[in-house]
Amino acid sequence: MSTTAPEQNNPNHYHPQAIEAEQQAKWAADKRFEVSNDISKDANTRYMLSMFPYPSGKLHMGHVRNYTISDVLSRYYRLKGDQVLQPMGWDAFGMPAENAAIANQVAPAKWTFSNIDNMRAQLKTLGLSIDWSREFATCTPEYYRWEQWFFLQLYKKGLVYKKLATVNWDPVDNTVLANEQVVDGKGWRSGAPVEKRDIPMYYFKITDYADELLDDLDKLEGQWPSDVITMQRNWIGRSQGMEVHFPYKNSDDISTLDVFTTRPDTLMGVTYVAVAAEHRLAKLAAEKDPKIAEFCELCKKGSVAEADLAKAEKIGMDTGLTVTHPLTGEEVPVWVANYVLMSYGSGAVMAVPAHDERDFEFANKYNLPIKTVIKTPEDHEGAYTERGTLVNSGEFDGLDFDGSFEAMLAKLEPQKLAARKIQYRLRDWGVSRQRYWGCPIPMINCEYCGNVPVDEADLPIKLPTDVVPDGRGNPLKNIPEFVNTTCPKCGGPAERETDTFDTFMESSWYYARFASPNDDTQMVEKAAADKWLPVDQYVGGVEHAVMHLLYARFYHKLMRDEGLVSGDEPFKNLLTQGMVLAGTLYRDNPEGGKTYYFADDVEISYDDRGQPTQAILKADGQPVTIGKIEKMSKSKNNGVDPQTTIDQYGADTVRLYTLFAAPADQTLEWSDDSLKGPYNFLKKVWRETQSHLEATQELGLQVANLPAASSIDASQLDSLAKGLRRKTHEVITKIDNDLGERLSLNTPVSSLMELANEIGTFISKNQQINEHTLAVQHEALVTLLTLLSVYAPHIGEHLLEKLGVDTTRLRYPEADSAALVQDTITMVVQVNGKVRGKMEVAPGTDAESLKAQAKAIESVAKYLTGDIKKEIVVPNKLVNIVVAG
């Protein structure tokens, strides 16, 4: 948005770029947003935190919305007098950096720190009130040394163990793939068919905390979104059921096949059992039958992701083995099936085709028996999965679920063929990753001593940072200086662990490190943690509901038990912001997919309502399809560059728009044209302030010396001035309630716009320009700008300074109860229920006076020609006169 030099010097014009740079420089110079841990014990502290970003190198609108939300709340609570901590850091390890490094042939460390520099500069242009003195990146040894130290403490406690885990293996790149890197059963980079492979990995015993993680969700009710709480409950998945043992007679090593079921009432309907390819019975069968061995190998190929298995075709093979049904004594065939995972439960399931959809599908495919044991409606087709009355179950016929559960348990438990059991869907957290760009695991592998923890004195175990990975295997294995070491236990030659930590480790405790980020003597300073934790308001996407948020809750409990923090939960309140959406433009391509285009490359026509009607690609003049409104993404080319928008309209306009256009927890449909509304609003505020300054100067007065509006006797103000004072203090009260109680971030902007309109009306209609009316106008403007500074801090503080306000001492304005009292109220007058007039009356006017005044109104009197049957008065609202005929 270009301007000529004379315009730039004109105070009546709003030039956001100039004032925003000026205000940001002031904030940086006086370290406005830095907070000390040495503040008074009596100070009210508040910790506001948005989920820290991965340093991709460029902000997107999702970032802008996320950080603006937490910044508005931070600025509001500072106005309320709180000591507010709003820090920023970088979730800097992880696969994206490694992949980018491979593609660009650059060391991930160099790529990452360059991106951090770019994103920090972008964040600062948004005017965020961040304490940058606490900034850190998780890929620095100063941070991850404490992660390594904490791992060693957990290892000593027995909360860490090592076991074989089944992973996705790319045989060409010789590397482990995350589930999302498996595309149609093939490696995303090499295109090679993915295999399952067992490799040793370290695990955290998160299941030891399953009950506490589940039960403590009750403490978050009303403070976290209910859908997030539900997702965590389902993810932990506490199930009460029965473990049933099916005897196996043909092996000295295997006495029973153990299965867990939440539906023991269907036990009499079991017609086969299914086991994973890695189960001991499957291996036993594979040793005897090459075809079964071949099938088991087939099952080991493909993704190990639960979601992928759910979509995959269910296949199986009869092992020829049988187990004994614990109730009937009948022999039940054992099948190996691809839908059973060894990593879930015992790696075996009892199959009841009549009452389980997956078992029903499998049984029909392989012509296996289907036995109904729950009374089923006659017209029902397929598997009947509801609970009900038992049938075809011998002595258990006629029992309901609870009755059959107890009866079967009473019969089987004395024979050690069943036991009551609680099982969790939650599995222990595998924290090993076969990747380079991550925190090294502080363990040593000794041929004689096994797995040995590193001496704490040797921490941090530093990751070599000058490595340029090629995507084939873990490069750490090929660095002798890193790998070769001595065993801390026996002193002999040994090798360092080359796996690195899951990056969820870094993001599980970063919030606590912000309390004492520069402490090089301990992971978390307890006194500082007690001062700031728990986080008062956490802001982030709902997509983190069951990974990051669950692991952070787990980590907090671990740190609590280590004496590092207090309290049971890390985040007191959680706000999950909605996604930012935008329209898409595309053409179908010959490959059967879609080619998406940037909006800047397309000429779009609109109808009278502003709806797009036609889109033409500028490059060839041919039409493109106007697609759905979808989440902004690189793949859809529908993202909006925040910096471009800031350069055009200013950061204050972008901040206002992202919060005004939709409630914070709902999706925001981006529209470039809609930015003009907030931009014009800020220009209006600018003009009103300039008008006030000019009017004050014309009377030879100074804004700093105007009397306080509250000190002026109300009798000296006309109705226009009283109305402006009333609106001013109504807005003070409403915004305080919206932000402090309701956490409604869009409605305050509407209130600010209403107040600006009221000020504009006052300026245009006020005929008595004097010290008193200027004082009322001044109060309204200072209030408007103070509250506006929460959303649009640059223009807000800049104009406040013009009005003589010290912005370093800014506080939330106090509502004046006297100003809220109305001298008159407007009442509606109806005749036979139809509005015929209005009247201004004093509050509390008696009913008879109201009736008389209503009938005297000219527009009402002409309808009172018949007999008056009834006169209804609703105090302070309306008078309704009922007339005959």
From Swiss-Prot:
GO terms for biological process: leucyl-tRNA aminoacylation. SUPFAM superfamilies: Anticodon-binding domain of a subclass of class I aminoacyl-tRNA synthetases (SSF47323), Nucleotidylyl transferase (SSF52374), ValRS/IleRS/LeuRS editing domain (SSF50677). It is an enzyme of class 6 (ligase). Keywords: Aminoacyl-tRNA synthetase, ATP-binding, Cytoplasm, Ligase, Nucleotide-binding, Protein biosynthesis. GO terms for molecular function: aminoacyl-tRNA deacylase activity; ATP binding; leucine-tRNA ligase activity. Gene3D superfamilies: 2.20.28.290, 3.10.20.590, HUPs, Isoleucyl-tRNA Synthetase, Domain 1, Valyl/Leucyl/Isoleucyl-tRNA synthetase, editing domain. GO terms for cellular component: cytosol. ATP binds at residue 634. InterPro entries: aa-tRNA-synth_I_CS, aa-tRNA-synth_Ia, Leu-tRNA-ligase, Leu_tRNA-synth_edit, M/V/L/I-tRNA-synth_anticd-bd, Rossmann-like_a/b/a_fold, tRNAsynth_Ia_anticodon-bd, Val/Leu/Ile-tRNA-synth_edit. A motif ('KMSKS' region) lies at residues 631-635. It catalyses: tRNA(Leu) + L-leucine + ATP = L-leucyl-tRNA(Leu) + AMP + diphosphate. PANTHER family: LEUCINE--TRNA LIGASE, MITOCHONDRIAL, LEUCYL-TRNA SYNTHETASE. Belongs to the class-I aminoacyl-tRNA synthetase family. This is Leucine--tRNA ligase. It comes from Psychrobacter sp. (strain PRwf-1). The gene is leuS.
